[in-house]
A protein has these predicted regions:
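A conserved structural motif in NAD(P)-dependent oxidoreductases
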Residues: 69-73, 84-95, 106
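Conserved catalytic-core motifs of eukaryotic protein kinase domains, centered on the activation segment
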Residues: 14-16, 58-60, 126
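Short, small/polar-rich loop/turn modules that mediate ligand/substrate recognition or access, typified
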Residues: 39, 44, 110-112
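Conserved SDR Rossmann-fold cofactor-binding beta-strand/turn motif
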Residues: 44-54, 103, 116-118
């Protein structure tokens, strides 16, 4: 089993992440091509598209943005979650559970797929 950890930017560009917005869709395209080549051998190849997952990186970036915007960290975090239909950040363990599923025998007929773990952040139907 191969599971690529990509980004929601594959389907919906993220502001000011130009490099990520350009490169990650290409990696998922590569993943799809690999799935075509190795699936007959019983190898599955899938990718996870995490949304905004509450990690130290997100917290540190939010602190900097709050300072630059002259607002509290709590206000900045509230502003961020307001853009997510689930109205909360994802947790690292939620992404880990999705990876574990795709790496398991239960996902043996799933290949070439992208799984969004984003609380509804990605607005695309596809």
């Amino acid at each position: 089993r191969i599971v690529l950890l990509a980004s929601s930017s594959v389907k919906q560009p993220v502001a000011n992440l130009h490099l990520s917005n350009g490169i990650r869709p290409g990696l998922v395209g590569f993943m799809k091509s690999m799935a075509d080549e190795v699936s007959a051998d019983g190898v599955t190849v899938n990718s996870i598209l995490p949304g905004v997952i509450l990690t130290d990186r997100i917290t540190n970036n939010a602190k900097l943005a709050a300072k630059n915007q002259n607002i509290t960290l709590e206000q900045r975090l509230d502003n961020m979650t307001a853009t997510i239909p689930a109205r909360r950040f994802g947790r690292p363990d939620e992404v880990a559970e999705a990876v574990a599923f795709l790496a398991s025998e239960k996902a043996s007929y799933i290949t070439g797929a992208t799984l969004q773990v984003d609380g509804g952040l990605i607005r695309s139907n596809f």
